[in-house]
Structures are given as C-alpha cells and as structure tokens.
Regions:
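Glycine-rich, proline-tolerant flexible connector loops at the mouths of alpha/beta enzymes
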Residues: 54-74, 93, 130, 210-211, ...
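Active-site mouth loops of central-metabolism enzymes
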Residues: 21-38, 92-100, 180-191, 245-248, ...
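Conserved, mostly hydrophobic/aromatic
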Residues: 3, 47, 51, 59, ...
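An alpha-helical appendage that flanks or caps ligand/catalytic pockets
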Residues: 4-28, 140-175, 215-323, 357-359
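N-terminal beta1-alpha1-beta2 module of alpha/beta enzyme domains
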Residues: 1-81
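Hydrophobic faces of well-ordered beta-strands that scaffold small-molecule active sites
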Residues: 3-7, 55-57, 87-89, 117-121, ...
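Internal, glycine-rich beta/alpha segment that forms the wall or movable "lid"
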Residues: 12-15, 26, 95-202, 217, ...
C-alpha cells in the first residue's frame, strides 16, 4: 500500500477569523499567507523523509480552509524545491475550468518532470460552483464533457475542432503534449456511478473520498465491474482513498479525540440558507443513497486508534475497497494544531507506515 499526505496549505486562522463561507478577504494576512506557502514545502520535505510516497493537493476557493485555489501552481511550487516525492493534483475542478487550459498546464508539469505528477479530474462540490457562478445541475455533464476534451487534447496529434454543449473551440492543438504514453497517471474522482463509468471506459484510475469503508467498497466494486465489461482489470494502484484519520499513541487517546469531534462544526461552514440552495440533486452513490454536501459539520473519520488498531483498519480497507493508495489527513483541513499534526505524522511514519508496505 502507498501512502499520500493531503496538503491543504494550513493558513493559520485565529479567533478573529470569520467562521463562514465565503470568508471575507479582508481577514487575509499577507505575511501569514506567505508563511503558509513556505510551510507547504517544509511539510513536503518532512513527509518525504518519513517515507510517504505522495503529497496531494486539491482545488478550493474563497476560504483559508484549503489554500490551494490553483493546484498546478502549488504543485510547481513544491516540485521546484523538493525532489523525489510524487505530487498528486486531486483535482482541478473540471466544470469550473477551461478544459484546454487544464490540459495545457498539466501537460507542462508532465513535461517538466515526467512521471512525477499524478492527475485527478474532479467534479467538485456545490459551493465551488458558486465561486464561478455555475449551475450545479449542469455539473455532471460539464465534468464529463470537460474530461473528454482534456483526454483528447492530450492524445490527438493533429488539430481538431470541438463543438460540445458546454465547450466550443474552432481549433485545439496543445503544446506541449504530455511525454507519457498513452497519458500521464490519471484518475477520475468521485463515488458516483457516472465517475466509475467514465473511469472504466477510459482506462483511468478511480479516486474516492471520505465515505465509510463499506460505502467506498460499493463504489470501487462497481468500478471493477464496469472495467471488466470494458475488457480490463484495474490494479490496487488504480484506486485512491482520501480519508481523515485520528492517530494516537494509544487507542484511548484517539477515541477521546474522536469523542470531542462529535459535536464539532466545520471550521468554515456554508450558511444554512445557502446550503439549502446548493444541494446537488443528482449526486448519488452507486448504492443509491442520497449524499447531500457535507455542510456545517466536520468531515467523517475513517480511521481512528493507536498504531496497531490503525494498521488493522488500513488492512481492512485494502481488503474491502481494494485501495492501493491511501491519501490521509490527520486533522480536518484548516483546523487543529499544526504542531500536533506534525507529531502525529511522525508517529504514523514510524509506527504505521513500515507495517502497511506489504499490504
């Protein structure tokens, strides 16, 4: 099993930081922002020394919760100063982006350091659509069309036109093209049946996130079924599971931390009236359960315990989900104590990581 660290930027919030979304930019401190980006590089070096395989980034807007509105820029920043560790961009958010620009920027990264970057194509959540004034009901179709266009732009050696429902280009011919063939290491991200179908049809990996092991096993099971129908079999490294983890020196320490979270609110929740307006009506998992956006609550914990219990839980995830890459956050993005998180990362690197390599 490979292990990735989910890097959020970790802007240092304080008691005066507004707890709402969007967070007014008047609260932004330029010195704190610069410090946060320097710390991203320091953490990348730290987790690399601990033996982590990847560091991952994700696109979010209008909040200090995750300070990476442009994953390609963040990836280039880390890659220019830290050697070796792979960098996973999970996503960009496809429906909120210009697909040609995404294809070009990711191709640039792959050309600069071939094989070092991993790309995930993401549909995103409803509040992110509001950032760029998009209709949430169109997100699924915009995502599929945008991903189709990105893949074709990477692969097509001759100029072509594109006249889709959401994107129209008279001529597409990107420079540079990715040096890897048939494409860079790429995943479709999401637990929906549509995400699994797209990934299977295009021979892509699948990235799932934040659901229970049982629910994620349904999603990856459906993905493998669809892959079989398209005549290929995904391996463990074709499945990424992003998740939150509470790791303690003992089970009791971790359980106490979990108990404290039960009444916690998300660090920057969407206002209730906005939340009701932004429920993504077609976001359903492969088991048919409605999954509205996680609004006003902290994200769920997938793994909790001391090192021995967490090792057992990770083995269970490997067996049930078939996951080959686990992408972990040891505290909720944007909350918690950074110093304590670094201590838990070191504990994970010393007491957990060596025991899951063979899983």
């Amino acid at each position: 099993m490979k292990v990735s660290f989910f890097e959020t930027g970790r802007y240092p919030v304080n008691s005066d930081t507004p707890r709402e979304w969007p967070v007014p930019s008047a609260a932004y401190d330029p010195e704190a922002g610069a410090k946060a980006y320097r710390a991203m590089v320091e953490r990348a070096r730290f987790v690399q020394k601990l033996g982590f395989d990847w560091i991952s980034l994700s696109e979010h807007h209008y909040s200090p919760r995750i300070l990476t509105p442009s994953p390609p820029l963040s990836a280039a920043h880390i890659a220019s100063q830290v050697d070796g560790i792979k960098i996973a961009l999970l996503g960009p958010i496809v429906p909120a982006s210009n697909p040609i620009r995404v294809a070009e920027e990711l191709a640039m990264l792959d050309t600069m350091q071939p094989g070092r970057f991993v790309f995930g194509l993401l549909r995103g959540t409803t509040n992110e659509y509001l950032s760029y004034d998009l209709n949430p009901k169109e997100a699924r179709e915009r995502t599929d069309e945008g991903m189709e266009l990105i893949l074709k732009a990477w692969a097509e050696p001759q100029p072509f036109g594109w006249q889709g429902r959401y994107f129209q280009y008279r001529t597409v011919s990107i420079w540079p093209r990715p040096p890897q063939s048939p494409r860079p290491e790429t995943y479709a991200l999401g637990v929906s049946a549509e995400a699994s179908e797209f990934a299977a049809r295009h021979h892509l990996g699948l990235g799932v996130s934040y659901g229970s092991i049982d629910l994620m096993a349904q999603a990856t099971g459906y993905y493998r079924e669809r892959c079989a129908e398209y005549g290929w079999e995904p391996g463990p490294d074709d499945i990424i599971y992003r998740c939150n983890m509470i790791l303690g020196e003992t089970d009791e320490e971790a359980d106490a931390a979990l108990e404290r979270r039960k009444s916690a609110q998300a660090p920057f929740p969407i206002a209730a009236n906005l939340a009701r307006a932004l429920i993504d009506q077609d976001r359903r998992n492969v088991g048919g359960e409605a999954r509205p956006a996680n609004v006003g609550r902290v994200l769920p914990i997938s793994f909790c315990g001391g090192p021995e219990r967490v090792i057992k839980q990770l083995r269970q995830a490997r067996e049930q989900i078939g996951v080959g890459v686990v992408d972990i956050s040891l505290t909720d993005p944007g909350s918690g104590d950074t110093g304590a998180m670094m201590e838990k990362l070191e504990l994970f690197g010393k007491k957990v990581l060596p025991h899951i390599r063979e899983v």
